[in-house]
Amino acid sequence: MSLATDSIFVTALQSNAELLYKLTESIDDDGTTVIDETPRLYGTAIGLPDEDAENVPVPYVIVTFDGLTNDQSTKDDRYESEYDTVNIGVEVTAKTLDDLHELTQMVRDTILSYLRTTDTAIQDYNFAAQQIQYDSLKPSYWQVLTYQCDVNNTNDDEQD
């Protein structure tokens, strides 16, 4: 289950229709609002289309699986501990700081609500946010939210 934790986050974000709509809107170079067919929500669970790889329209969200650890006590333990600590990154990118703040709050609220109301393997998590960055080439603002999740990695009958 630990290796699919990013899919839980993608599913959570897909459950918010308002967020998905905001991820379909963009403004082209002449200031015209453009509505795409699909939201720009990407990650290891939803690949980035090849044609967009170099120039993804803003705004977008990318969910990444950033590795895991397991607190196995010693090499002589018969089993690993029943929980993995899984790191998930959620990159939020927007055209303006106001848009970034709004999208970031929507992402945080959506994930929190989903994890509180949906039975998943995620038992608990810690949250951190990196500083806001500016990309002058795009131009856009972005921020990475990091979730460190305790994920149950065992089946009920696995350890006797």
Language model region names:
Residues 1-74:
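Small/polar-rich, solvent-exposed N-terminal microdomains that initiate assembly or binding
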Residues 9, 13, 41, 61-63, ...:
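Hydrophobic beta-strand residues in large extracellular and virion-surface proteins
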Residues 70-71, 98-100, 153-157:
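Residue-level signal for secondary-structure boundary sites
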Residues 77-81, 103-108:
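"Short basic amphipathic alpha-helical interaction patches in structured regions
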Residues 80-98, 140-153:
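Oligomerization/assembly interface segments of phage tail-like spikes and tubes
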Residues 105-160:
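Acidic-leaning, charged glycine-interspersed low-complexity segments
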